[in-house]
Amino acid sequence: MFDKLEAVAQRYDELTQLMAQPEVATNVTLLQQYAREQRELEDIVTTYREYQAAQRAIAEAEAMLDENDPELRALAQEELDTQRKRLATLEEQLKVLLLPRDPNDSKDVIMEIRQGEGGDEAALFAADLFRMYTRFAESRGWKVEVDSLTENGIGGIKEVIFQIHGEGAYSQLKYEGGVHRVQRVPATEARGRIHTSTATVAVLPEVEETEIEIKPEDLRIDVFRSAGHGGQGVNTTDSAVRIVYKPGTPEEIVVTCQDGRSQIQNRERAMTVLRARLYAREQEKRQREIGASRLAQVGSGERAEKIRTYNFPQDRITDHRIGQNFSNLPAVLDGELDKIIEALIVYDTAERLRASGISNN
């Protein structure tokens, strides 16, 4: 571990020297590249230097234990105990910082929510989830853009595709992919019976055009008049866009966007969603090829995987991947997801540490 830390610290200092060179300072692209690389190393280097400072403090305190003055020895022992605890804490932090980063963590996110089993109640639950994620994003100061929304006429959602733009959006929301289940008494249930319904959530990192190639000949692009929520026409021009990737083949993907202000905007959004889906497909294929059944220890985010149950009668949310329960269900559905997300990150980090085999060498 410490050999790697030394190499990281050396590269960090090297980048500082490179950015000070006149030929780099005048090359904006290269300067940004070096600055971005240095930012990625900064937390590791800062923590490592704190670790080295703690090591020096321990050595100094140990030397003071040989003093004749009992008060000085007592102070030295106190300092030694403090710095040893600090050293152990910093060492654990360094192990986490050295874990490979998900290259998508800093990206914006595309989310898709669809009603599952349960009819209208499933559509109402899908609407609850959409509101939950929207409120969570707003609490972070992130921007939410709806690409496509299909409602069922009674306030429920059959399908919604939306984008969330914000620093680290994917790192926070990537654990939300899968089947969400709700247990509650529907408003239309006269006998008070508890019904179980589901909704499916897909979470995709936004992908740059340069990250995945899409050939124009593989696309069929249709334009049509956008419809309002519930099927009411709201636009007198053909502003809605449907993009079909490799139509009529097993690889076919259909993306429809109609909530943008113009045909150009809807086309751009549809292409963004298509790139994300193709990227996700490539990632899944790569995982299968290397024999991995999970994209992360807490779950793959596959649509068939039941990840969480929202039990209204017992005011309990259970995340099945980590076997942990959470209370205050109304607050969670109002966007207070922090405790759940933090628990998932902690669990995932611990599992990745266990699998990484990072040692103190």
From Swiss-Prot:
Principal localisation: cytoplasm
Modified residues (N5-methylglutamine): Q232
PROSITE patterns attached to this UniProt entry: RF_PROK_I
Post-translational modifications reported in the UniProt record: Methylated by PrmC. Methylation increases the termination efficiency of RF1.
Keyword Mitochondrion: no
Keywords: Cytoplasm, Methylation, Protein biosynthesis
GO CC, alphabetical: cytoplasm
Localisation per UniProt entry: Cytoplasm
Disulphides: none
Entry keyword annotation includes Cytoplasm: yes
Gene3D superfamilies according to UniProt: 3.30.160.20, 3.30.70.1660, 6.10.140.1950
Top-rank lineage group of the source organism: Bacteria
SMART domains: PCRF (SM00937)
Any one GO MF annotation of this record: translation release factor activity, codon specific
Protein task: Peptide chain release factor 1 directs the termination of translation in response to the peptide chain termination codons UAG and UAA.
Family: Belongs to the prokaryotic/mitochondrial release factor family.
Protein name (database record): Peptide chain release factor 1
Source species of the chain: Chloroflexus aggregans (strain MD-66 / DSM 9485)
